[in-house]
């Protein structure tokens, strides 16, 4: 290979909600960019993660999970974001979960069959499959569904075979100049990443009670004289009862969320962070396309 040659391309990571797409992206990048939680629908924006290694630059688009339910405006916009990611990439990584196959997986597969980009099938969470004897027949079933570029059993959680996927990606990057400087890991702003970190902590500490009805707006993000950042985050919920839930008994819950979010921000921004959080009720935001636009849910569509 000539020293002057460089390779660069876009790769979409797609799949139904909660199959481990964000965890896989974070593992491919070697650090945390996309938020992860056990709750479906934690990814709401298309996050671009960038991995540069020598002559190779892979630009990953982490899509919201494609899913069948489209009644709420936020679900329609998330599906639109995921579908548009599939259309303009060099390669697709389709993530499925162990030996599970659902109508949502089928829907994603149908969209991929219509596309031109080659597809790597990442069968995630294989380490969690109880009946190992079921795995091979299931892989054979998957192989019969479409002409995949490759089928790779992986564990995004432990990192098993993630390097194999990275190697396949490198091999299929077209010759092109790099889009981003070598040290870039995402094209998202620090302000955006701060809101994602807070949202992850909300998802993590509030259990199943708040599936979509919480979002975060960063009202203030400024450098301070101590070489760090002062950040004010506004947590928006849909009902008064949810506000009480976020605040917790004598403010205990929001305090925990703030402490954990600040730790992650300091690690990501490599600087001290002073974080203040407020909670406000804004009813119906997840059903209101105008509200969603103002909160940045359609900034890249």
Swiss-Prot record:
GO terms assigned for molecular function: GTP binding; GTPase activity; ribosomal small subunit binding; small ribosomal subunit rRNA binding
One of the protein's GO biological processes: ribosomal small subunit assembly
PROSITE patterns: G_ERA, KH_TYPE_2
Keywords: Cell inner membrane, Cell membrane, Cytoplasm, GTP-binding, Membrane, Nucleotide-binding, Ribosome biogenesis, RNA-binding, rRNA-binding
Gene Ontology annotations for the cellular component aspect, listed alphabetically: cytosol; plasma membrane
Region (G2): 41-45
Pfam families documented for this protein: KH_2 (PF07650), MMR_HSR1 (PF01926)
Residue stretches making up the KH type-2 domain: 206-283
Superkingdom of the source species: Bacteria
Binding sites annotated in the UniProt record for GTP: 15-22, 62-66, 124-127
Segments forming a coiled coil: none
Compartment list: Cytoplasm; Cell inner membrane
Positions of the UniProt region annotated as G4: 124-127
Membrane topology: Peripheral membrane protein
Start and end residues of each stretch annotated as G1: 15-22
Domain named Era-type G: residues: 7-175
Region (G5): 154-156
Family from the record: Belongs to the TRAFAC class TrmE-Era-EngA-EngB-Septin-like GTPase superfamily. Era GTPase family.
Subunit description: Monomer.
Protein's job: An essential GTPase that binds both GDP and GTP, with rapid nucleotide exchange. Plays a role in 16S rRNA processing and 30S ribosomal subunit biogenesis and possibly also in cell cycle regulation and energy metabolism.
Protein name as it appears in the record: GTPase Era
Originating species: Citrobacter koseri (strain ATCC BAA-895 / CDC 4225-83 / SGSC4696)
Lineage of source species: Bacteria, Pseudomonadati, Pseudomonadota, Gammaproteobacteria, Enterobacterales
Gene name of the record: era
């Amino acid at each position: 290979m000539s020293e002057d040659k460089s390779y660069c391309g876009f790769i979409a990571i797609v799949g139904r909600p909660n199959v481990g797409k964000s965890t896989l992206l974070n593992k491919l990048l070697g650090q945390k960019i996309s938020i992860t939680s056990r709750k479906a629908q934690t990814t709401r924006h298309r996050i671009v993660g960038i991995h540069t290694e020598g002559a190779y630059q892979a630009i990953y688009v982490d899509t919201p999970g494609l899913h069948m339910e489209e009644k709420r405006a936020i679900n329609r916009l998330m599906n639109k974001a995921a579908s548009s990611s599939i259309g303009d990439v060099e390669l697709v990584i389709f993530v499925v979960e162990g030996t599970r196959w659902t109508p949502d997986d089928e829907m994603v597969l149908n969209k991929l069959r219509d596309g031109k980009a080659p597809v790597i099938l990442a069968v995630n969470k294989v380490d969690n499959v109880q009946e190992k004897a079921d795995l091979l027949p299931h892989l054979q079933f998957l192989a019969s569904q479409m002409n995949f570029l490759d089928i790779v059993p992986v564990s995004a959680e432990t990192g098993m075979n993630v390097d194999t996927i990275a190697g396949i990606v490198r091999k299929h990057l077209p010759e092109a100049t790099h889009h981003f400087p070598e040290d870039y890991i995402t094209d998202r702003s620090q302000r955006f990443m701060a809101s994602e970190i807070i949202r992850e902590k909300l998802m993590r500490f509030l259990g199943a009670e708040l599936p979509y009805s919480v979002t975060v707006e960063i009202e203030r993000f400024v450098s301070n004289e101590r070489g760090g950042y002062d950040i004010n985050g506004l947590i928006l919920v849909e009902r008064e009862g949810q506000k009480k839930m976020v605040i917790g008994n004598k403010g205990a819950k929001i305090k925990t969320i703030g402490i954990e979010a600040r730790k992650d921000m300091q690690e990501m921004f490599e600087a001290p962070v002073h974080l203040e959080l407020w909670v406000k009720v804004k009813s119906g935001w997840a059903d209101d396309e105008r509200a969603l636009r103002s909160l940045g849910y359609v900034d890249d569509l």
